[in-house]
């Protein structure tokens, strides 16, 4: 896929496995292209999912929908499990269809310290700071154990 904004940057030379300069198929100009990412897994947190893996994102989906399509397998974590009938009544609201999903896990407050509109709409600033500090200090495992204790 062609991308703009990379001319003059070192990214093209530093990461040739991702970027390539080629002649545009539409003009005589050169364009920078980027290799499509194909992750093994995507883990996406949603507001609602059914037992089969149909999932709804009730707010901004950011890149989650694209990730579900790019990944070889997707795990959905959800605030709550709902009846499949809800998806059948309004199929256009299905953000991720079941056939892209390998597993569904119910994880209330699974997006914290971030947000999951409309269930919780404020970023937990203290939680974000603690998360950042844990990464900086190499203590992410300890942090995750602390914030997930008693939730399984």
Enumerate the predicted regions with their spans.
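Conserved alpha/beta enzyme-core scaffold
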Residues: 1-152
């Amino acid at each position: 896929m062609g991308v703009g904004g990379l001319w003059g940057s070192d990214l093209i030379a530093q990461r040739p496995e991702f970027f390539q300069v080629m002649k545009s198929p539409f003009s005589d100009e050169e364009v920078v292209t980027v290799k499509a990412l194909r992750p093994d897994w995507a883990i996406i947190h949603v507001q609602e999912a059914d037992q089969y893996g149909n999932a709804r994102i009730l707010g901004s989906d950011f890149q989650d929908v694209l990730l579900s399509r790019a990944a070889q397998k997707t795990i959905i974590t959800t605030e709550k499990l709902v009846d499949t009938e809800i998806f059948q009544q309004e199929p256009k609201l299905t953000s991720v269809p079941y056939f892209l999903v390998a597993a569904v896990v119910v994880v209330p407050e699974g997006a914290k310290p971030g947000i999951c509109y409309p269930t919780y709409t404020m970023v937990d600033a203290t939680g974000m700071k603690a998360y950042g500090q844990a990464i900086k200090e190499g203590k992410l495992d300890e942090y995750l154990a602390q914030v997930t204790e008693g939730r399984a």
